[in-house]
From Swiss-Prot:
Acts as a key signaling component in the regulation of cell shape and cell wall synthesis through interaction with GTPase Rho1. This is TRP-like ion channel pkd2. The modification Phosphoserine is found at S599, S632. Residues 689-710 are annotated as: Disordered. Keywords: Calcium, Calcium channel, Calcium transport, Cell membrane, Golgi apparatus, Ion channel, Ion transport, Membrane, Phosphoprotein, Signal, Transmembrane, Transmembrane helix, Transport. Belongs to the transient receptor potential (TRP) ion channel family. It is a multi-pass membrane protein. It comes from Schizosaccharomyces pombe (strain 972 / ATCC 24843). It holds the Pfam family TRP_N. GO terms for cellular component: cleavage furrow; division septum; endoplasmic reticulum; Golgi membrane; medial membrane band; membrane; plasma membrane; plasma membrane of cell tip. Residues 1-23 form the signal peptide. It is found in: Cell membrane; Golgi apparatus membrane. The chain crosses the membrane at residues 173-193, 197-217, 322-342, 376-396, 404-424, 466-486, 492-512, 525-545, 555-575. PANTHER family: FLAVIN CARRIER PROTEIN 2, INTEGRAL MEMBRANE PROTEIN (AFU_ORTHOLOGUE AFUA_7G01610).
Length: 710
């Protein structure tokens, strides 16, 4: 048991999981050099150097500006995972060209060389683990002193990589196809097929997608985190619309410049850009202002990128094009939804031209077309709210150009207004139906087909008692986006905020359990728990309080391992659950609308109707109050399945079902499989029959138990 008490040994054991990397070519490299003292007399405009331990050779391409013209000694300090290696080098003993003595002016070195002697002994002291651990987090600091007076002349610093990373382009695209494409398909189908099974599938897909977005948000934080966390988040940047396409980047650069902004050129400069990616909170150089993010060859210019700037550069996207890239793919998704809506109507119309009973079917299409098309757009806006809120907050904070800043403000306000409108319309439907305390008011909310097609995504996945719960979740998303976008200059605040938000969400999920089924509550509680653990790790690693560097790196590896395992389990579990729901023989009893029919409420209501006349009871009994709203659409009348008649003369009279949704749900499964044996629910308008049988208790909908899914 002593093995696990040592963080260093634990780190070694975890790293052995990546032993497959030994089969690849081993090397370490550095591609940037920044100054670490004021008035440093040595700087670099270009640096690329790699060491290959297998053949003991080094390849380099260096351009250095020197103001030193004397003999010097070089102190080398290598720091990785809390371990430090220090060496003192005499350039004359090692016969380094241009350094014995050092010469003023530009020093250009390029080529390859096989190392021997002291230089080889220094590099051989590097542990073999440095060549295999993914996302190596190592820093090399070089201090140059005058040999005679021991006066410090220069200080430069570089980060070291080994080519191993948990980010892979293949993983990036596989995750995009596995998570994004199924979500898009079910999202576009959901306004058309209003079945409880589809509601459950869409909600689980959205949950998986939002978990992927959270992973991307971690990599966009300016908080000083281990490099492995940033690389892991890069695998999910597609969920934020960050997909690099060459010609689009050229268009965005032109647009930024033409609208008064100064486009960044870091990616275009390539190896000629002396860019340092911030690691472990070390200030590797002065952070250039956004409006003047360019690279020069002066002795003090070097650029350090953090947070969104860092991830943008790593994804090959200019920092000034970050918002435009994400926004463009959101617009493409909206346009694709429009094409799907238009194509679907065209195809259906063509099919109906050759079918019988054309008048009735055409009337259905025309009746529902507006609701279905609006449902497409509202669902895309709902799913893209996290993406666009973060990108808009970032653009408002940075103001790459006046046009982009205005566009970002318009987009976030427009999306927020549309989602608020959907929520308000839901509240209005409830208020028109009756008081909230009425047993059937919330049941009717789930039977208005046109409302379901447009705004059902706001509440169909929830327990009817918490139909409003999507709205506070959107507010939490907006607050999180503000901390990510506006908090790029306050990394510690970002880390604390992410932890606080995860605590709030976890508490809400555990205490309220707001979703309609036990399975969905379990899923969301599990995701919230994983986000809480991740938030706790970020709080530890954000340097809000002192933590040993080795401990931070171990926590970073554990963070990656837990989130990777959770993502794998979510993908497998959700897809297995989707198959079960789709191919289940009977949908009966799988997705009830649970009302908060407390015993006192049901008792008092039943007592109040005893004094009513039989005719009054026909309109007031909860068994006969109907399954649709007034002036809404009823899917379940056999004589006119898509009618738009007034429901004041319609009542639900299926004796075999406990609640309206029992019949609707089972009928939907029967229709999908062509099973005619299942009795279709129907509406009856003959109140004489109802009055004659108003004492039949079996014909009334009984209150569902409070703990049906608890």
């Amino acid at each position: 048991m002593r093995l696990w008490r040592s963080p260093l040994l634990l780190l070694v054991v975890v790293v052995e999981l990546f032993s497959w990397a030994d089969a690849l070519t081993r090397f370490i490299s550095a591609d940037s050099l920044s100054t670490c003292m004021t008035d440093s007399q040595l700087s670099a405009s270009k640096l690329y150097a790699s060491y290959f331990p297998d053949n003991q050779s080094v390849a380099f391409d260096i351009s250095i500006q020197s103001l030193v013209s004397t003999n010097v000694s070089i102190d080398v300090d290598i720091s990785a995972y809390g371990i430090e290696i220090k060496k003192v080098i005499d350039p004359c003993d090692m016969e380094i060209s241009g350094f014995c003595p050092m010469q003023t002016g530009n020093i250009a070195l390029s080529g390859s060389h096989t190392l021997t002697g002291e230089a080889l002994s220094i590099l051989d002291s590097i542990p073999s683990i440095a060549y295999t651990v993914p996302d190596l987090d190592a820093v090399v600091t070089i201090n140059i002193y005058e040999s005679d007076t021991n006066t410090q002349l220069a200080c430069v610093r570089t980060t070291v990589q080994n080519g191993r990373s948990v980010y892979h382009r293949a993983v990036y695209w596989v995750m995009c196809m596995v998570i994004g494409i199924p979500l898009l398909i079910f999202l576009l189908i959901s306004p058309v097929l209003q079945t409880p099974a589809l509601w459950e599938i869409v909600e689980t897909m959205i949950t998986l997608f939002q978990f992927a977005q959270i992973q991307a948000l971690y990599s966009m934080m300016a908080t000083s985190l281990p490099a492995i966390i940033y690389s892991w988040g890069r695998n999910f940047m597609w969920s934020m619309g960050i997909i690099r396409i060459g010609f689009m980047q050229d268009v965005f650069t032109w647009y930024v410049k033409s609208t008064g902004g100064t486009p960044s050129t870091l990616v275009d400069l390539g190896i000629h850009a002396n860019v340092a990616l911030a690691k472990r909170g070390i200030d590797l150089g002065s952070l250039a202002k956004r409006a003047t993010t360019t690279v020069t060859t002066s002795t003090s210019d070097s650029i350090t990128l953090r947070g969104i700037k860092r991830i943008s550069y790593m994804m090959g996207i200019e920092t000034t094009n970050f918002f435009a890239t994400g926004f463009s793919f959101f617009i493409i998704l909206l346009f694709f939804s429009l094409l799907v809506a238009m194509a679907s109507r065209f195809i259906v119309e063509m099919v109906l031209l050759a079918s019988r009973n054309q008048a009735l079917k055409k009337q259905r299409i025309r009746l529902y077309w507006k609701s279905i098309s609006k449902g497409f757009f509202y669902r895309v806006i709902f799913v893209g709210f996290t993406q666009m809120s973060v990108l808009s907050m970032w653009e408002i904070y940075t103001r790459d150009s006046s046009a982009l800043a205005f566009l970002s403000m318009y987009v976030i306000v427009d999306m927020a207004v549309l989602l608020c409108y959907a929520f308000v319309r839901t509240i209005q439907i409830i208020r028109k139906t009756g008081p909230y305390s009425h047993p059937d008011v919330l049941y009717n909310l789930y039977s208005d087909t046109q409302h379901l097609m447009r705004w059902g995504f706001m509440y169909v996945q929830l327990d009817v008692r918490f139909f409003y719960f999507t709205f506070p979740l959107l507010l939490i998303t907006l607050v999180r986006s503000m901390f990510i976008g506006f908090g790029q200059g306050s990394p510690k605040v970002q880390g604390c905020a992410m932890f606080g938000i995860s605590v709030v969400v976890f508490a809400l999920m555990v205490i309220l359990r707001p979703y309609a089924t036990k399975h969905m509550n379990t899923l969301h509680i599990g995701v919230a728990l994983m986000n809480l653990i991740s938030g706790s790790f970020i709080l530890v690693m954000c340097q809000a309080f002192y933590v040993e560097e080795l401990a931070r790196q171990v926590i970073g590896i554990i963070f990656f391992a837990l989130n990777a395992i959770t993502m794998l389990l979510l993908i497998l579990g959700i897809f297995i659950r989707t198959l079960i729901v789709l191919f289940r023989k009977s949908g009966h009893g799988t997705y009830y609308r649970i009302l908060d029919d407390q015993s006192e409420k049901a008792t008092s209501y039943n007592k109040s109707i005893k004094d009513m006349s039989s005719s009054d009871m026909a309109f007031s009994d909860p068994a006969y109050s109907g399954t649709t709203l007034r002036s809404s659409v009823d899917l379940n009348t056999p004589e006119y399945p898509f009618s738009n008649r007034n429901d004041s003369d319609s009542t639900f009279t299926n004796n075999k079902y406990v609640s309206p949704w029992d019949a609707i749900e089972e009928a939907s499964y029967a229709n999908l499989r062509g099973n005619t044996d299942v009795e279709q629910p129907f509406m009856e308008s003959d109140y004489t029959r109802i009055s004659e049988n108003n004492n039949n208790a079996e014909r009334r909908r009984k209150p569902l138990p409070n703990n049906a899914f608890r």
